[in-house]
Amino acid sequence: MAATIDDEVHALAQRLWDFHTAPAAHSPPTPGEHDIILALGSHDLRVAEHAAHLWDAGAAPLIVLSGQRGRRTAGAHGHDRWPRPEAEEFAQTARATAGIPSTAMLLETHATNTAENFTHSRALTAAHGIAVTRAIVTAKPYMGQRALATATAHWPEARWTFHCFAGGYTDYPNADTPTEELVHFLVGDTQRLDVYARRRWSSPVDIPDDVWRAYELLVARGFTNHLVDNDTTSHPRPTGRSVP
């Protein structure tokens, strides 16, 4: 079934957006309160710009930019393949945004998924003798729930806060990410919260009934491009899950 955008889709997608962005901090971080800013690599360079603004405001002395290439930046679905890792593209954007010196950045260029963003960055900071007890993670706004669920599973000793660039569901789309693609991403991230928790790749997240119903309706409407294999037979379902 071909996915088409209409008022029903907008309403359902808005519910997913509100859920996924709910963890985002709305007030500026206190200067000097965090050890690092971890920017999760992706195709959206606005994340790197926001990380640079956080650093410029004194949120943390160091930015860790993490990412090799994901499906999209590797050239999937007809998109251009980035010539270098996401972390390097993010670093260039951060420098251009706030003049961040190389001494204030660590580049982690091997992670190909969100779990690796955290595990590889954790190893990198440890190798540099950097103790991380309080940290900011920034990513695309709709990754709020998944970023924190992954952080608590793979870097649990740090206290994490999620920050993202401003704007809502109607503000996020641009020429690079049209509304239809955003809806596919929202649906995919909702599924990942369930599937990845059952695989123990991330911590369980309570998904309200109306959010799960919105997800199911959007899947039925054809928004399935960002879904993953749902086979978790070899990964026991964790306790404490409340997905209906």
PLM-predicted stretches and their roles:
Residues 175-232:
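A conserved mid-domain beta-alpha-beta active-site/ligand-binding segment of alpha/beta enzyme cores
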Residues 1-186, 241-244:
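A structural signal for short, hydrophobic/glycine-enriched beta-strand patches
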